[in-house]
Amino acid sequence: MINTYVSYQLIAKDIGKSLDRVQNQPVVERETEYYLENITKVKSIKEFVADDRLFRYAMKAHGLEDMAYAKAFMVKALEGGVEDKDSFANKLSDKRYKEFVNTFNFEAYGDTATLFTKAQQGTVDKYLRQTLEENAGDQNEGVRLALYFERKASSITNAYEILADPALKQVAFTALGLPDSFGNADIDKQAKLIEERIDLEDFKDPELLSKFINRFTTLWEINNPTVSAASLVTTLFTQPEYGISTNLLLTMQSMKAY
């Protein structure tokens, strides 16, 4: 089995082709065709949630598939919109709900909400990316986490956003070598440490973000090996273009001993 580090690189180095492969999957093709054919027919929140197939596609596109059953909850979020800073969606710590409501902003645009690109092809693009990440996770959870972090990182504005998102938190804790038990510490203490050790502005620089994710995937593999330690080291030494130095490898080997 290919290790986490290499698996991530194979997908990320040509994300366009990776997404094309997802788009050509028969199930994805059928669901996407249905979505695009029907979304512009939706004129209200009631109609939106009534079409379960359509609604589930939209929810999955925003990483909320597990909440597709909670229609009353989502109706409340949609009815409140995002214009009012005190709206239900804006008050939720999980930003995915706000993003969803912003995409399908019936509160602001009424029966024209689904005519915007973000509700049509924009949602399809998100669905394809979400499916790509989920497919990767079926083989290796570390790859899914890396792809998710890559997608979200540039929009992170503070450490609390990392802590509020389980996937972002998992990546940050792993990359920083923090034990899961640290998650039980006072939330302000957690945020302070993260902001001391990570310059969030670095995530707006593709090269610096890549280095951070490379560190995560390598440490994830050490903690959750898909291949032997010897094979991992051999693979990394033969992949110099990915920027893992000998010193970093030696450091990570010593970390494994603890």
What are these regions (language model features)?
Residues 1-258:
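Type III/flagellar secretion export determinants
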